[in-house]
Amino acid sequence: DSHVTIMQASASTLSENIEIARFAEHVGVDLIMPSYPLGFYPQHPDEVIGYTSELASATSLGMIVFAMNLWNFTRLHPSGFAPAWLEELVDTVPNIVAIKNEIGDPGVAGLADVFRRFTGRVMVSDPLEMNSPAWTQTFGMGWMGTSNYEYFGAKVPEYFALLQEPGGYDRAMEIYWQLHPARSASGMLMKESNAGTSFVHRLLWKYQGWLQGFNGGALRSPHLRLHDRQMQLLRRAALDSGLALAPGEDAEFFVGRVRA
């Protein structure tokens, strides 16, 4: 009961994503979070709002609106996902329950505006864990996701829980700084892989989880190639952060712990 399952609707068309969402509802998934297809090129904000609303209305699942600046919507609004669009969606679509808030890079003013507008109306999360101490202090952010926190073992949930407690901030920051070598390495590699691609390096994320005992193994294409220097940097940074690593040589990652 303490776990919430989220299905990311990232297929190639709206109709495919509606089909996936209905299947997810049938098998008991809790929430849906849409991506926007690579071929989706809206000419007006109403198309973004309409796509999101139609997918949300196709099931009774709660929806997390994935508001970020990498959907190629900046021609429609400089933030990449206008707060006014979110206002209309929250006001008119009753099963929108949360916002994954990544608009307006560079800087945090756009993020803060979304927190200011919507905290108390829906759940608002900045998924970048390095920002969580600021948002819990200023806006009471009580949920964070989704991202590659498994690289840090159980430490991110541990310090995030402390941030919610009166008097827990100092202890939370001790853990926060412990993780900084791993955080810095991960951030550097993600910036490197994202540059010019708008593509999250999911195989790298999967390797990060594998270091903590997750399965590893292949991903379906398309995805970016994972290089030795990247694996070596992530392994070393995790050890520098005092994280215990699961056994296994890097070659074993590509096979996976459980073979089909």
Features from the language model and the residues they span:
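C-terminal alpha-helical cap/extension of soluble enzyme domains
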Residues: Y151-A260
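Active-site beta->alpha loop and helix N-cap motifs at the rims of alpha/beta catalytic domains
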Residues: D1-P78, L224-R225, A244-A260
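Catalytic alpha/beta core domains of metabolic enzymes, predominantly
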Residues: E54-N194
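Short glycine-/small-residue-rich flexible loop motifs, especially phosphate/cofactor-binding loops
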Residues: A21, S53, S132-P133, K206, ...
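Helix-coil boundary/capping segments in enzymes
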Residues: D1-A21, T119-V124, A185, S198-Y207
